[in-house]
Amino acid sequence: MGVDLTGVQKKKRVVRHHTYSTNPYIKLLIKLYKFLAQRTNSAFNKLVHQRLLKSRSNRAPISLSRIAVCMKRKSVWLEKGKKAPIAVIVGDVLDDVRMARIPALRVCALRFSKSARERITGAGGECLTFDQLAMVAPTGKNTFLLRGRKSGRESVKHFGAAGVPGSHAKPFTSNRGKERQRSSARRRAFRHK
């Protein structure tokens, strides 16, 4: 007599072994970090290789202010005379106008927005690419791996059932007419009479 294996299919973990990206730069970086992960016994290179394989939505962007805050927390524990670690982001770095002053940071990322690059270099920092990082820190020594919030996307706000008690899901609304749904409630003039 057999046993019902319920829920086994749900526990499957998707692990990517190749990229679906057509970007030649990312493809070369995947080759480079796969080689480094095999040759050096470093968990950093394995992690970077795994993150390079991820889809665009799983390589979430991060703001400059978030990097600055994380690096400030990290630098509290630094010994005197020791160089600050390089912030490594497998994704995009975006500017944050809410933060007036940015400290001198060494940041490595796949892409920098124009204003973010200007602000980092203007503050006396350095913007590195991943092939430059492989030369500077082939084993990932003195680096700090960061990533952005995946839940920051607009589409994630709509996940779930809107209007259900305890749910904070954002409803899909259209502002095409006065009888149509504006938010989750009807307008006062058009309430049920």
From Swiss-Prot:
Q: Which GO terms describe its cellular component?
A: cytosolic large ribosomal subunit
Q: Where in the cell is it found?
A: Cytoplasm
Q: Which UniProt keywords apply?
A: Cytoplasm, Ribonucleoprotein, Ribosomal protein
| Entry's Gene Ontology BP terms | translation
**Where is the region Disordered?**
158-193
One MF term in the entry's GO annotations = RNA binding
Chain intervals with Basic residues compositional bias = 183-193
Q: Which family does it belong to?
A: Belongs to the eukaryotic ribosomal protein eL18 family.
- UniProt name for this protein: Large ribosomal subunit protein eL18
- Species of origin: Trypanosoma cruzi (strain CL Brener)
The major lineage groups are:
Eukaryota, Discoba, Euglenozoa, Kinetoplastea, Metakinetoplastina
